[in-house]
Amino acid sequence: MPATTRLITIYGATGNQGGGVARSLLKNPCFQVRALTRNPNSPASQELAGLGAEIRRADGFDSNSLLAAFEGSWGVFVNINSDDKAFRPAGPTEYDLGMKIVDMAAQAGVQHFVFSSGPSSTELTNGKIRMKAMEMKNKIERYARNNTQFQTVSFICAAWYLENFLVKEIAPLFGGFPFVADAEAFLTFRCPRWGGKEDVPFISISDDYGDIVQGLFLDPHRWNGHVVHGCSDILTFDELVTHFQNVTGQKARFQPLESWETFDTFGVPELEDTKLMFGLTQTTGGLYFGPEPSEKNTAAALKRATAAALGLPRDQQTLITVKGWFQKHFPVTPN
């Protein structure tokens, strides 16, 4: 155990992103992890406790609760659930919560603030597309940048979750892939085209996301002000289904929808931003993370830094590929 450990507090610790960050940091004896949650008795909270995290109940809308939760923290990672039922159009909004988190973290003396952010869809599309979640997160990012009490602020924008392909309930939204074959016996992945060169960024939350964020905390001054493209691999939808077919032996194909506007959300409000995402990337020529093309070199460097800090061999210091991810999660189908 090192003589000095640094406390990282995670807001949203029981979610996908926050949980991934917690599990990565808990592997490094240089860090202590405080996991904030509304329900300390939940299975996700108890799992983190079993790994060595301090579990702390906290209410994001209560300033005193947040201030106490952030007390003594060297760093903070924040991911806000944009679909939180507590948000209302007239307030409180995600931005209201984000401002309070930033203010209380700064007041508590936090030195290094990392936020899961997103670009402004309205700015990228000249007002043609407005993704509510992205707009809120981008406003919070700007608010955090303007807070001069932090030593560093850095940001990460998560790509398309590969883990979504493990959720059978999601498959019908995308033609049934990778679980339900169509009438022609194909596992068909159906969605709008991405746009531009059709280079789609994907992230494995369980394999890479937490390590990328840990890399930011390992050298926070180097990454001060940066927005990291949180992705494991970048490839086309056609390449994705080809990898799946080659790995599993099952027939698979990509069938693009003619228009992003025809993507069926089945009346689920939370899926509206998914539909608008395709409108964003088609309007911007494939841009998703901001005004610059998607890249994974930065994520790869952060992954290497974390792997080296954990003493892992070189063959475990790389981001997982989509092909490797399918090999890990989908068995070969016998002939």
From Swiss-Prot:
GO terms for molecular function: oxidoreductase activity. Gene3D superfamilies: NAD(P)-binding Rossmann-like Domain (3.40.50.720), UDP-galactose 4-epimerase, domain 1 (3.90.25.10). SUPFAM superfamilies: NAD(P)-binding Rossmann-fold domains. CDD domains: NmrA_like_SDR_a. It is an enzyme of class 1 (oxidoreductase). Its EC number is 1.-.-.-. Coiled coil: none annotated. The keyword Nucleotide-binding does not apply. InterPro entries: NAD(P)-bd_dom_sf, NmrA-like, NmrA-like_oxidored. Keywords: NADP, Oxidoreductase. Pfam families: NmrA. Hancockiamide D displays potent cytotoxic activity against murine myeloma NS-1 cells, suggesting a potential antitumour application. More interestingly, hancockiamide C, the likely end metabolite of the hkm pathway, shows potent Arabidopsis thaliana seed anti-germination activity, but is inactive against the monocot Eragrostis tef seed, suggesting that it could be a herbicidal lead targeting monocots. The herbicidal activity of hancockiamide C could be due to its phenylpropanoid-like structural features, which may act on the plant lignan pathways, and hence warrants further investigations. Pathway: Secondary metabolite biosynthesis. NADP(+) binds at residues 12-17, 38-42, 59-60, 80-82, 137, 161-164. The keyword Transferase does not apply. GO terms for cellular component: nucleus. Belongs to the NmrA-type oxidoreductase family. NmrA-like family domain-containing oxidoreductase; part of the gene cluster that mediates the biosynthesis of hancockiamides, an unusual new family of N-cinnamoylated piperazines. The NRPS hkm10 and the NmrA-like reductase hkm9 are proposed to convert two molecules of L-Phe to the intermediary piperazine called xenocockiamide A. Xenocockiamide A is then converted to hancockiamide D via a series of hydroxylations and O-methylations. This is NmrA-like family domain-containing oxidoreductase hkm9.
